[in-house]
Amino acid sequence: MGSKTREKKMTSRPYTGNTDGNHPTERPGTKRFVEFMEYLFGMKSLGIYANRPMRGSASLSVHATWRAVDLKGKGTAKQNADARKAMVEFLFAHRDILGIEEIHAYDGVGCPIPNLTKFGGGYRCDRDSWKAWTPQKNAGTPGGDWTHVEIAPNMADSVTAIEKAFAKIFG
């Protein structure tokens, strides 16, 4: 959202995290969501599924659930940042209808918190707000030039749910 726009508070929703466990088969809604990000914002997927622990933790990564994707814009560093900023602002504005559970802005691109450090910031649905990351509490890749997005299980499992959500947004 632009700097002159107040953050519209939505309803906080439960955060799934990795509670659905390793899911080694593709979730078609996640793939369709990525296709929309590629089409709308010129993103490229850096990966969805990876059965591995989170960075700096023994806990399972949400990538193992087939509900998380890392996205990067194409082109120059500026083009990448501009595309990610537009995408993050869009995802945040439509977070409820799209079932967005978490957004990691490793380098702060698109995050509405001013004066972030190199650790960036993140959005989570259960607090329905952004949080500035610190050297002690961050997502493990400070300054990363990509964006991590997690969607809800019902969206990840359904192409129809994803398509209906985007149809409602662009109605």
PLM feature spans:
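C-terminal partner/receptor-binding element of secreted or periplasmic proteins
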Residues: P142-F166
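Secreted/periplasmic proteins that engage bacterial cell-wall peptidoglycan
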Residues: G2-P135, G144-I151
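Short, cationic low-complexity segments
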Residues: I97, A167-G171
